[in-house]
């Protein structure tokens, strides 16, 4: 199979752009998609995002996390540079950890309409406690809905060694 044609990438405007503007306020409008060339098969796409930051909505203190985003695409896929810039836009966004993860998941569902998606934030401790919110979604009425239920019930059965924070 040949690579993608320029026509296939017409909606990808941020990748390769040397004049990238970093937004410091939450903005889902920056997200871009491209077509999935393999919609006839299930496969995971996973993003490991170790530099996520947001602000505590009460104190304004910065929060830091590694975020893991995994999804099974349908017709559209999120472009990685736009995802990076979107996550950066949380830098001055005041929200609780749990809210940030659900907002990210909801924005990606709206953007891509994936078969399945999960978002897991592993935040660095504040006050001696780390918070690791996990949320997922499987398309209703499909096997992915059952998959989401199963993964939710089994997502954290094995306690981790906290050595990366």
Curated annotation (Swiss-Prot):
The Enzyme Commission number assigned here is: 1.7.1.13
Q: Where in the cell is it found?
A: Cytoplasm
Q: Name one GO molecular function term.
A: preQ1 synthase activity
Name-wise, this protein is NADPH-dependent 7-cyano-7-deazaguanine reductase
Name a Pfam family for this protein. Answer: QueF
Keywords of this protein's UniProt record, alphabetized? Cytoplasm, NADP, Oxidoreductase, Queuosine biosynthesis
Query: By its UniProt entry, which InterPro entries does this protein fall under?
Result: GTP-CH-I_C/QueF, NADPH_dep_7-cyano-7-deazaG_red, QueF, QueF_type1
| Gene Ontology CC | cytoplasm
Task: Name the PANTHER family on file.
Answer: NADPH-DEPENDENT 7-CYANO-7-DEAZAGUANINE REDUCTASE
Q: List this protein's GO terms for biological process.
A: queuosine biosynthetic process; tRNA modification
Top-rank taxon of the source lineage equals Bacteria
Q: What is its main location?
A: cytoplasm
Signal peptide positions on this chain: none
Q: What family does the entry list?
A: Belongs to the GTP cyclohydrolase I family. QueF type 1 subfamily.
Q: Which HAMAP family match?
A: QueF_type1
**NCBIfam families of this UniProt entry?**
QueF-II (TIGR03139)
Give the pathway listed in the UniProt entry for this protein: tRNA modification; tRNA-queuosine biosynthesis
Q: Which organism is it from?
A: Bacillus thuringiensis subsp. konkukian (strain 97-27)
Specify which residues bind substrate according to the UniProt entry for this protein: 78-80, 97-98
Q: What is catalyzed by this enzyme?
A: 7-aminomethyl-7-carbaguanine + 2 NADP(+) = 7-cyano-7-deazaguanine + 2 NADPH + 3 H(+)
Functionally, this protein is described as follows: Catalyzes the NADPH-dependent reduction of 7-cyano-7-deazaguanine (preQ0) to 7-aminomethyl-7-deazaguanine (preQ1).
Residues of the active site = 56, 63
